[in-house]
Amino acid sequence: MISFIVCLLLLITGYLTYGKIVDKTFGPDDRETPAVRINDGVDYVVMPQWKLFLVQLLNIAGLGPIFGALQGALWGPVVFLWITFGTIFAGGVHDYFSGMISERNDGASIAEVTGKYLGHTMQNIMRVFSVVLLIMVGTVFAVGPAGLIVTLCKSNGVSGVLSTTLFWLILILVYYFIATFISIDKIIGKVYPLFGMCLIIMAVGVIIGIFTNPNYTIPEIWSHLYNMHPSGTPVWSFMFITVACGAISGFHSTQSPLMARCMKNEKQGHFVFYGAMVAEGIIALIWAAAGCALYEVTGGLNTGLAEALAGGQSAAIYDVCSKTMGGVGIALAMIGVVICPITSGDTAFRSARLTLSDWFHMDQSSYANRLKLCIPVLGIGAILGIGNATGLIDYTVIWRYFSWTNQTLAMIVLWAAAMYLFTEKKNFWMAAVPATFMSAVSCTYFILAPECLGSLLNSKTADGTVIYNTAVAYPIGIVFAALLLALFIRATKKRSAKKSA
């Protein structure tokens, strides 16, 4: 329990200290923000700081810090270290700069921001990359909740059309269309802060339930400095990829521009962007602690948690909430597993619309222009979702690559932030160091993961246990990261030479 408390205090201290250093390095001032200067009444709308924070938290979180943290807890309390230091030095930096650099560029989507600092080729790659990722996220966060609602309906004796996935999927997609089309302050700005509060209350309830129950003990890091994963999956770099949103996530960079278009003052950035990431880190830390404390450890391995997760991640959330909060927890769990994914899904589609509008320079104050983008974006989502629900399409093959693409996106955004800082003659190492680290993480995972190159390089024992080829993957990951750092330094020298010429 001491480990947990220390990590919690470090996260809070990190926000108050390193977060301030990051903010000071960027240098927010009193210039007019895009929300004030452009104010189109659709995407550029001034919202109060507390709403910006809660909407940003819900947009970047959803169930990410819960699912990822519970999965990360399979490796044991060592996951506390990554959540804590990853949030402070990587995730917070990533989210802050993706939001604030966007704000300095009229609220531009992350693809446009990246292109400005990493070149036109990277811009086009990021445009396609972002739109595909966002539509996939939106679709998955429509199909998932629809299936959960059907399960709840059937368990309560509901039959007929209300017990079909197709009905609820269409209903969710219709809502997504409305939320993607209308002004950001009509639904997202009014309702989402309430759900953001629910996410926080659920986490607080879980940790209070653990602290007040003598049967639950959060293990200490120093007593479990070994791999507790039942399958023996390597800590590096699987844990770093699995935790995702609880420490750093590239998806956040697609969401930050939404709030960058709604800030009244640049000085709100520290609380809205860095603060929301720290809040998500705290939520992830709590759920990781729950995963470590509530389930049986057999032979030094987290077998109990593995069994709980085998029943489905939503079932695991339900189990944790019921054990720690009883009936209230069950109600919160139901809200969480249904509402939170939906709130990430609609903003994913909205971000896809904005990415395309920036790409093709389409004014979004026009109803016609918004329809021109909403219809194809939601249309593709509907085809994928309904096709999957009816068994005609299986997009899970593409979705398997989400973990890798998500953190690769984070890596690219950090390199863009580093180049921005260099261009502005500021401490670029603040972003370059985590960018280098995430480059090693992303490359190593790509080599080891079964859905990537792992199926070719790894081997199996007679009982089916995977033997990961770390002897090849680890050196390649390190060399790849060092190479990108060298290329970055070379690019900075070229820019300096051009300026002095």
Where are these regions (language model features)?
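Membrane-interface "cap" regions at the ends of multi-pass membrane proteins
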Residues: 10-66, 265-268
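Extracellular loop-to-transmembrane helix junctions
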Residues: 2-19, 72-102, 111, 329-330, ...
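Helix-loop-helix module between adjacent transmembrane segments
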Residues: 10-11, 15, 56, 90-106, ...
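Extracellular/periplasmic helix-exit of transmembrane alpha-helices
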Residues: 99, 209-221, 275-319, 386-393
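Loop-to-transmembrane helix boundary motifs in multi-pass membrane proteins
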Residues: 123-127, 162-170, 275-285, 292, ...
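Hydrophobic, membrane-embedded alpha-helices of multi-pass small-molecule transporters
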Residues: 47-64, 207-215, 224-287, 332-344
